[in-house]
Amino acid sequence: MRHARKGGGGGRLAKTNKDTRYQALVEVRKACRACGTGLTNPSVCENGAFDCEAMGEWSHWQGNLDAPLMVVGQDWGDVAWFLREKGRSTNTSRTNTTLLKLLASIGFQLKLPYQTQGNGTLFFTNAVLCLKSCGAQSSVKPEWFRNCGHRFLRPTIELVQPKIVVCLGERAYRAVMGAWQIKARKFYDAVTSPDSVLLPPCGSSVFPVYHCGARTLNTNRNFEAQLADWKRIGRFLHVGD
């Protein structure tokens, strides 16, 4: 595992406990076959040659268990992309490069995946952890979000306990709300609302934002509008600083 130890004796014990619980959750993720046809667990692609000791490759890039902010995406992609990139998040992904600009706007200076060492500063994960079998743009099934939400997404958020959970896109937002059985609002209203949703008992505040991939940037929400959306996250994050 790449998670650094820090702090005094009590802090070391708490960190060790977090690491142990996280690794146990990762092992359950690797063994999961709940969704069946349409999804493939990274642990079986090329006999697990490109899988990682994290909830997924996005968490391998940013997997700090004490992160103040967690980003939840929809899914990582499909089997073909995973094999082509040998299981690594790419430096050239429009989603990744734009996300780093948005995070920089609220004070987080992160590096691209191949330039990142250690477990990073934040925690990234996806609402669906397995890989699509029929192409990156293929449809996703509601039960995939339900299965992953209760088995992995909620336990991961409760383990990390970030101050803020940023939901990247409507499906990620609905997955988080569904994992807590909280009624989701209309997405635009949720994005533009001055109020966040509090997740009990961990106390994380949920902020949905539009996806920052090329298609959404070019059609639904341009970069300038997304920067404005992220400003409210920055204000909340730095209250009391």
What are the roles of these predicted feature ranges?
Residues 193:
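Basic, amphipathic alpha-helical patches used to engage nucleic acids or provide basic targeting signals
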Residues 16-188, 196-217, 222-239:
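A polyanion-binding, active-site-adjacent surface
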